[in-house]
Amino acid sequence: MENARLIEADAVVIGAGPVGLFQVFQLGLQGIAAHVVDALPHVGGQCAELYADKPIYDIPGVPVCTGRELVALLNRQIAPFSPQLHLSQRVETLQPAPDGGFLFATDAGAALHARTVFIAAGVGAFVPRTLKIDGIERFHGTQVFHHEEPAPTRGRQVVVLGGEDTAVARAIACAEPGPEAAASVTLVHRRDAFQAAPQDLARLQALRDSGRIRVLAAQVTGIEAAAQAGTPEPGRLTGVRLLASDGTEQGLPLDTLLLCLGVSPRLGPVADWGLALERKQVKVDTATFSAGVPGLYAVGDINTYPGKRKLILCGFHEATLAAFAAAEHLAGSPVALQYTTTSTRLKERLGVAGAGTP
């Protein structure tokens, strides 16, 4: 941590799912600026990854919305507070600082000193699922890329592996005319059926009909690599081996392999932070949602307490009480309850000062 520039923060929220985003909002109302760290390259957590196009019916005041729509609404709600986002990063270490705050570092090399920390990591950090093929890891970052990682595609033979919205979107992006258009695009999935938004499925079909995208119903069973000159080590990935649904095998040449196999949650370093855990969840005090250490809070699916219900709306309640507790912790004194309908200070923080009261 000594080699990285230390970022000072009043609050750091670990996790950018709906509860983490609402935590930012509640902290903003208390006048506390927040930094947000998430392993995904975008905000939204489970809602964005697993329920983007699925309807949600139990958000108060919103009869129905998709996961994507809920994330967009929360993004709009926190905009006045301009949180600093540290995406595609996972917190690796968390330790007490001499002044009573917290020091932690991410796997991307960022180092932060936070006066308060809010663990809103859901069921854990979402990390891309990988392909369990011997030797493929040596090509990661040069020819093999996971999930939404940027990848060179211009003029290349691109193979996209996966059957959900990210795979479909990446295949379309590679096949569309433009400066990064691939020479060829092959979308490989175990069956010729895909889960994506209707407009993306329609565009995929159009690109298939025009010959810009080829779809193969198969599974990858191995890789093919050319030897590096002068050594027995493979220097370049040249293709993958496929087992088709009819039992036949074939080789598929490629320059770039995009693995869009979804993501899976991992509790990861949270388990090593010395917190009181019960079934991989952080035990909290329901008055403050403190994780047992002054200034450290846990909200949402990552916490547990008697009567716990893993619902988004329950997480919103937890984030509200945690923000009040943090404000009192930082101030060293009780914090007055204010209402957004009448408080001039809250309206100023929201950027709506002078707005009339209905």
From Swiss-Prot:
InterPro entries xref list: FAD/NAD-bd_sf, FAD/NAD-binding_dom, Fd--NADP_Rdtase_type_2, Ferredoxin-NADP_redctase_2
Key words of the record: FAD, Flavoprotein, NADP, Oxidoreductase
Pfam families: Pyr_redox_2
EC number: 1.18.1.2
Residues that, per the record, bind FAD: D38, Q46, Y51, V91, F126, D301, T341
Keyword Flavoprotein found: yes
Gene Ontology molecular-function annotations: ferredoxin-NADP+ reductase activity; flavin adenine dinucleotide binding; NADP binding
Cofactor note: Binds 1 FAD per subunit.
Intrachain S-S bonds: none
Annotated catalysed reactions: 2 reduced [2Fe-2S]-[ferredoxin] + NADP(+) + H(+) = 2 oxidized [2Fe-2S]-[ferredoxin] + NADPH
Cofactor(s), by name: FAD
Family affiliation: Belongs to the ferredoxin--NADP reductase type 2 family.
Assembly description: Homodimer.
HAMAP family: FENR2
Designated name of the protein: Ferredoxin--NADP reductase
Organism field: Paracidovorax citrulli (strain AAC00-1) (Acidovorax citrulli)
Origin organism lineage: Bacteria, Pseudomonadati, Pseudomonadota, Betaproteobacteria, Burkholderiales
